[in-house]
A protein has these predicted regions:
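Conserved ABC transporter NBD signature motif
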Residues: 57-68, 72-73
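The feature captures the beta-strand-to-loop junction immediately N-terminal to the Walker
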Residues: 34-36
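Catalytic Walker B motif of ABC-type/P-loop ATPase nucleotide-binding domains
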Residues: 151-155
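Conserved ABC ATPase "signature" region
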Residues: 97, 101, 107-123
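ABC transporter nucleotide-binding domain
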Residues: 170-257
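Helix-to-loop junction immediately C-terminal to a conserved catalytic motif
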Residues: 49
């Protein structure tokens, strides 16, 4: 199922929280949504889930829209918010049985989800007695139980231990790659986004500032090196159009961002121009590197 988000705008009172949001998520793609607190991530996710109404714009799941095809739209989407909304007087098991009955889920699938939730006998107790972590496990389990064609997860590892986070990651990758389910995931834990997502969208102050950071295909590299003559080196860099970014970490120590296929020619040019350097280190560009770079460019 392809998801198309078209010209979404949202205001709260006189404050604009989303401005002309346009993005596409392909069938089977896992997309990360990254931004500071208050950037508009949760609002966008709630609009996608049909919880919040935008001022203008539309969200389409293939050709389904919330406004015209509400029942079918909601059948095809599973949504987990940062602070799960549960019926506190019902038990976790009551929630599971209710969703399973609505969606004609097999007992094998129910047993698999109960194992994933992993809260023991507490599953039979009222949700009012659950910790945040237990509520998060249950909400995730219910989303995975339903298995809509589009899963939206807002801070899904909040309250989860390491083993549960790893298990969730494996399950989401399986759903995307084996069952062609589309997934949008927001998290402040960039390492989690990096491990699971195909592509990352950066949002700031309600605006998408980059939507094509492809974690699977990026060919960018970081080069960290110490140069003997700082002025000479900076003069060379100012004339080199292949350098995508430059940061002076400390005196005479620089961090450069460059395409991987240009590294050898860059190093050869330094030698040819007698620009001497020491302690050169080459590494992949991480999501954190890109996040910092994007923030600095604004």
């Amino acid at each position: 199922m392809d998801i198309n988000i078209i010209n979404i705008n949202k205001k709260y009172k006189n404050r604009k929280v989303l401005s002309n949001i346009n993005l596409n998520i392909s069938s089977g793609e896992i997309v990360g949504l990254v931004g500071d607190n208050g950037a508009g991530k949760s609002t966008l996710m709630k609009i996608i889930a049909g919880i919040v109404k935008p001022e203008s714009g539309i969200v389409k799941l293939d050709e389904l829209t919330f406004e015209k095809n509400r029942i079918e739209y909601l059948k095809n989407i599973s949504f987990v918010i940062e602070e799960p909304s549960l019926y506190l007087e019902m038990s976790g098991l009551d929630h599971i049985n209710f969703i399973a009955k609505l969606n004609n889920i097999s007992q094998n699938k129910i047993d698999e989800i109960i194992k994933f939730i992993n809260i023991g006998e507490s599953l039979k107790k009222r949700c009012s007695s659950y910790s945040l972590g237990m509520k998060q496990r249950l909400a995730l389990g219910l989303a995975l139980l339903k298995e809509g064609n589009f899963i939206v997860l807002d801070e899904p590892t909040n309250g989860l231990d390491i083993d549960s986070s790893i298990e969730l990651r494996k399950k989401l990758i399986f759903l995307a790659k084996e069952k062609n389910i589309s997934i949008l995931i927001s998290s402040h834990i960039l390492s989690e986004i990096e491990k699971i997502c195909d592509r990352v969208i950066f949002i700031k102050s309600g605006l998408i500032i980059k939507d094509n950071f492809n974690l699977k295909k990026e060919t960018l590299k970081n080069i960290i090196l110490v140069v003997e003559d700082r002025i000479e080196f900076l003069g060379y860099i100012s004339k080199n159009n292949n350098i995508l970014s430059l940061e002076e970490i400390e005196s005479n120590k620089f961090k450069i961002n460059i395409e991987s296929n240009l590294i050898n020619s860059f190093i050869n040019e330094l030698s040819n121009k007698n620009i001497h350097y020491t302690n050169i280190l080459i590494s992949d560009v991480s999501l954190e590197d890109e996040y910092i770079s994007v923030k600095r460019s604004e």
